Amino acid sequence: MFKGSMPALVTPFRNGELDLETLKKLVEWHIGEGSNGLVPVGTTGESPTLTHKEHEVVVEEVVKAAAGRVPVIAGAGSNNTLEAIRLVRHAEAVGADAALVVTPYYNKPTQSGLIAHFTALHDCADLPIIIYNIPGRSVVDMSPETMGKLAELPRIIGVKDATGDLARVCDQRSTCGPDFMQLSGEDATAHGFNAQGGVGCISVTANVAPKLLSQMQAACLAGDYATALSIQDRLMPLHKAIFIEPGLVGVKYAMSQLDLCSEEVRLPLTALSDETRALVDAGLRHAGLMN
């Protein structure tokens, strides 16, 4: 159910407020362009700077707009287990297909703490849970052994892996089993991740190039890595440019260049520098997305 290219959706703003009309248009556009799923209110969706109510509204609107045509994986992570439970239960109540739960950031739990946290989330609802392991942001790295223990729980179904370590795919397959779903969380290494046994990517760049990334993921799933590599080469300058500064800022600027949404972000994030804008523009042209 959760395979292929799934954009980590941006949250559009206009004059400091949620721009829900643009959000709905983006959902339609992504489905039309071939995206295989939608992932609202993750890092790229600026979840840290949304209010609790805004977080819930975005999930609700994406679920309603998708209307069952593609799965919706709702961001539901927190370093407060009780808050994460509330988010998982809300995602289930409004009809999301799964919850994406980041490892608790800032308070640095042990591996035992990670097991307790994710077990509590597993037990609080009937919603499938995808672990989000991103040690560069959370400052805690879930080990393959810990992941293997959590994979024994029936509703812990997979991982979004943003470690950048392609050897992890094999290690996690060994500890979690071949049916445990592994999704890349890094656009620049997604091709190699799939070659190691991954089945898709929760992608930032897919916000601006959904058709190309859907085609790349489809080629990987069909075993046609040569075609997938040609698409990845076409997109690599854009991947790299988007992440020179925070990726959601880069991709919102790229989207604004294609009139998809405003580049507006919330503090403490700020607009791209002129130098980075020029590199994103060059990446868009290299990908054939802009003249």
From Swiss-Prot:
Could you tell me where this protein is found in the cell? Answer: Cytoplasm
Q: In which pathway does it act?
A: Amino-acid biosynthesis; L-lysine biosynthesis via DAP pathway; (S)-tetrahydrodipicolinate from L-aspartate: step 3/4
State the reactions this protein catalyses: L-aspartate 4-semialdehyde + pyruvate = (2S,4S)-4-hydroxy-2,3,4,5-tetrahydrodipicolinate + H2O + H(+)
- Is this entry keyworded Hydrolase? no
* GO CC, any one term: cytosol
Pfam families noted in UniProt: DHDPS
Site: Part of a proton relay during catalysis. Where?
A: T43, Y106
Q: Which GO-annotated molecular functions does the record name? A: 4-hydroxy-tetrahydrodipicolinate synthase activity
Biological process per Gene Ontology, one example term? diaminopimelate biosynthetic process
List ligand-binding residues for pyruvate.
Answer: T44, I202
Enzyme class, spelled out: lyase
Asked if the record carries the keyword Lyase, the reply is yes
Quote the catalytic residue positions.
Answer: Y132 (proton donor/acceptor), K160 (schiff-base intermediate with substrate)
EC no.?
A: 4.3.3.7
Principal localisation: cytoplasm
User: What SMART domains is this protein classified in?
Assistant: DHDPS (SM01130)
Keywords (A to Z) from UniProt: Amino-acid biosynthesis, Cytoplasm, Diaminopimelate biosynthesis, Lyase, Lysine biosynthesis, Schiff base
Coiled-coil stretches are none
Described by its record, this protein's role is as follows: Catalyzes the condensation of (S)-aspartate-beta-semialdehyde [(S)-ASA] and pyruvate to 4-hydroxy-tetrahydrodipicolinate (HTPA).
Family label: Belongs to the DapA family.
Could you give the subunit structure recorded for this chain?
Homotetramer; dimer of dimers.
Name by which UniProt lists this protein:
4-hydroxy-tetrahydrodipicolinate synthase
Q: Give me the gene this protein comes from.
A: dapA
